A protein has these predicted regions:
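Short, aromatic-rich membrane-interface segments at the entry and exit
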Residues: 40-49, 108-113, 164-171
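Alpha-helical transmembrane segments and their helix-entry boundary regions
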Residues: 82, 134, 148-149, 187-191
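Functionally important transmembrane alpha-helices
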Residues: 33-35, 167-223
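N-terminal, membrane-interfacial amphipathic/helix-forming hydrophobic leader that caps
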Residues: 1-68, 202-225
Length: 225
């Protein structure tokens, strides 16, 4: 191998390592909060520290790569097409969840439902951005689209562990949102799908299947096995 080819190969590997390290650091910051900080009485500043640092890293990474908000999927571009592609699986999943709720007589409004619903739009958009606008885009730099989609969905499910029903639901949702984002990247459309599905899960899934939406170590503290 010639010197230029060796240098090019080394640069490629370094770039891949940087992309992978960025994804791992963001995922670890989320897991740190879920497993080491959130279950215990810590200050708000300490609790928000890792996510804030992760957000700064993501924004800096976008700046270094000259990625714009429009490029990431914030904006009107592809919105109609993405929403159309997501409509089928989203409505099908909603119908299935409501059917399960009807059959099991579990349709209900949980405590603080409307308050939680008011917070959901911003929360699901942040999740979609972290999952697709950042993690998927970084993995996509050195992986085949299908590989990147599956791994991204797996990471999204991982941060919802050990809540098994949520792990399954988020993995399936991550696959659908990832496939659509690969074709027509629009975060607002995927956030709408995420919002509708989350609201349906809250009112339709039986409590004996999904007793709460808690994740991480707090889930183990609040649920006996």
């Amino acid at each position: 191998m010639s010197a230029p080819e060796s240098s090019s190969s080394s640069n490629t590997l370094s770039w891949q390592a940087i992309n992978l390290a960025e994804v791992i650091s963001v995922v670890l910051s989320i897991l740190l909060v879920e497993w080491a900080l959130a279950p215990f009485a810590v200050s708000v500043w300490l609790l928000g520290g890792p996510p804030l640092l992760a957000l700064v890293l993501m924004l800096y990474s976008h700046r270094c790569r000259r990625e714009t908000a429009q490029t990431l999927g914030f904006g009107g571009r592809y919105f109609d097409r993405a929403l159309l592609l997501l409509a089928g699986p989203t409505l099908l999943a909603i119908a299935a969840l409501i059917f399960v709720g009807y059959v099991t007589h579990s349709l209900h409004l949980p405590d603080r439902f409307w308050a939680r619903l008011c917070l959901l739009p911003g929360w699901v958009l942040l999740q979609q951005y972290t999952m697709l606008g950042f993690s998927y885009r970084r993995l996509r730099q050195f992986l085949h689209p299908y590989q990147a989609i599956i791994i991204t969905a797996g990471l999204f499910a991982l941060v919802h562990a050990p809540n098994v029903p949520l792990v399954i639901l988020t993995f399936l949702g991550g696959l659908i949102w990832g496939f659509v984002y690969e074709r027509v990247p629009n975060l607002f459309a995927s956030a709408i799908s995420h919002l509708l599905l989350s609201a349906t899960v809250l009112v339709a899934v039986p409590e004996w299947v999904l007793p709460s939406m808690t994740v991480g170590y707090r889930y183990l503290l609040y649920h006996s096995f």
